[in-house]
């Protein structure tokens, strides 16, 4: 389980993930709460999260192709530096009293574009550092850092908002991303033999499309990722609504719900890392998908805050488990030089979350948050049953 930490580069990248993930959690919790305070509208929250997801759809494959073309270390440094500036602009707009919904939408869109380059670079860089044999351990342990710090990040962001104001989490997250810049800069570049480095980004894009058209298993994994993103990972849209209007627990409660989500994710990541190179990756993927849907239904229908936290922990376990297994299976079912583009295709798949975010927000505006979230959880259960019956090869992975 701990073998990847023998590599100094992986250890530094792990610390980078911890710092950057704390910044990400601050951004998600604080910006979602900000939008609800500005608009008092679930539909606006849906729009906000749709804008956040849209760059994945527009630039996902470009980001993956660029990760195969460029030095991944240098690309990560650029991405984290740009995150610093996004956080500072957010903070100064709030403290000046100028912040409007369109500012938040523009900044979260820019942040989303950066993420389409950062995520495939970071995930592919993990495998560069630890090798394909340790890919499951490396990716799972990296997820441990991400989910583990999210427990602190969710609760801390809510506390900072309550005690010091809405602007301070954005200044703190800028400092965290600056730490990430210095950590990545300390990693020695890993030179891997990549045919993609000899090709243009557009040629890499063409080859990415060919991978999907020729590899039916990759297509199935992308479809699962897309539907999971639409109906499962859209749930953060309504977390501020559940916290403020249904459970009546305020900004701190909103942070705690996100903390339990990360806590569940931490448990899943630790479990996957301890499994090593499991022979049942496909079955695990299907189980996580099913748990995700059931967890959302239970979370949406409990009026008791403590139970809501427990069910959100269940959602966190299944969300993190599905995320990790999806990324691992994509990287292991393509050629070595195609891993960046594989992650770009995954990024493209999760871009379909834009449809889920807008639909969930619209349903909540019209029929209430409980109904909307329950419908999406039910659709998750239906989809995984259909995938189990129609794609038998998934069970064999």
Give the location of each predicted region:
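Helix-loop junctions on the cytosolic side of multi-pass membrane transporters
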Residues: 124, 128, 170, 174-199, ...
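Helix-loop boundary and gating motifs at the non-cytosolic
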Residues: 1-55, 214-261
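C-terminal transmembrane bundle of multi-pass solute transporters/carriers
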Residues: 58-61, 69, 73-75, 79, ...
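Substrate-agnostic recognition of the 12-TM MFS/MFS-like secondary transporter fold
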Residues: 11-28, 51-65, 71-86, 103-161, ...
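Transmembrane alpha-helix termini and helix-breaking/packing motifs in multi-pass membrane transporters
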Residues: 32-38, 91-96, 152-172, 245-246, ...
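Helix-breaking motifs and short loop linkers at transmembrane-helix boundaries and internal kinks
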Residues: 39, 71, 93-98, 301-303
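Helix-boundary and loop/linker segments of multi-pass membrane transporters
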Residues: 2-7, 22, 96-98, 197, ...
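Short amphipathic alpha-helical coupling elements at transmembrane boundaries
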Residues: 127, 140-143, 203, 207-214
């Amino acid at each position: 389980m701990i073998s990847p930490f023998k590599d100094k580069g992986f250890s530094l990248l792990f610390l980078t993930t911890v710092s950057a993930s704390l910044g990400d959690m601050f951004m998600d919790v604080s910006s979602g709460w900000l939008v609800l305070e500005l608009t008092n509208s679930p539909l606006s929250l849906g729009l906000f999260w749709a804008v956040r997801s849209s760059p994945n759809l527009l630039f996902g494959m470009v980001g993956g192709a660029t990760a195969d073309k460029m030095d991944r270390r240098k690309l990560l440094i650029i991405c984290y530096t740009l995150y610093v500036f996004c956080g500072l602009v957010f903070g100064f707009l709030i403290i000046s009293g100028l912040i409007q919904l369109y500012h938040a939408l523009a900044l979260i869109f820019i942040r989303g574009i950066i993420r389409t380059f950062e995520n495939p670079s970071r995930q592919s860089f993990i495998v560069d550092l630890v090798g394909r044999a340790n890919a499951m351990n490396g990716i799972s342990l990296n997820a441990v850092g991400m989910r583990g710090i999210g427990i602190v990040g969710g609760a801390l962001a809510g506390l900072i908002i309550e005690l010091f104001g809405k602007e301070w989490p954005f200044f703190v997250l800028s400092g965290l991303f600056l730490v990430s810049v210095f950590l990545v800069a300390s990693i020695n570049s890993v030179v891997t033999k990549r045919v993609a480095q000899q090709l243009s980004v557009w040629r890499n894009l063409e080859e990415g499309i060919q991978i999907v058209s020729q590899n039916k298993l990759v297509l199935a994994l992308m479809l699962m990722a897309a539907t999971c993103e639409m109906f499962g990972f859209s749930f953060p849209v309504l977390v501020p609504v559940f916290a403020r209007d249904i459970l009546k627990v305020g900004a701190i409660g909103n942070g705690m719900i996100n903390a339990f989500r990360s806590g569940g994710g931490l448990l899943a990541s630790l479990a996957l890392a301890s499994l090593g190179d499991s022979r049942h990756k496909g079955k695990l993927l299907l189980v996580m998908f099913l748990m995700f849907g059931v967890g959302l239904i239970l979370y949406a229908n409990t009026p008791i805050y403590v139970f809501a936290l427990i069910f959100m922990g269940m959602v966190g376990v299944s969300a993190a488990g599905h995320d990790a297994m999806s990324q691992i299976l994509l990287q292991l079912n393509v050629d070595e030089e195609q891993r960046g583009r594989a992650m770009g295709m995954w990024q493209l798949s999760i871009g379909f979350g834009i449809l889920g975010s807008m639909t969930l927000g619209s349903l909540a505006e019209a029929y209430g948050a409980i109904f909307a979230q329950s419908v999406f959880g039910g659709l998750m259960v239906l989809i995984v049953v259909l995938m189990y019956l129609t794609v038998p090869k998934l069970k064999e992975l």
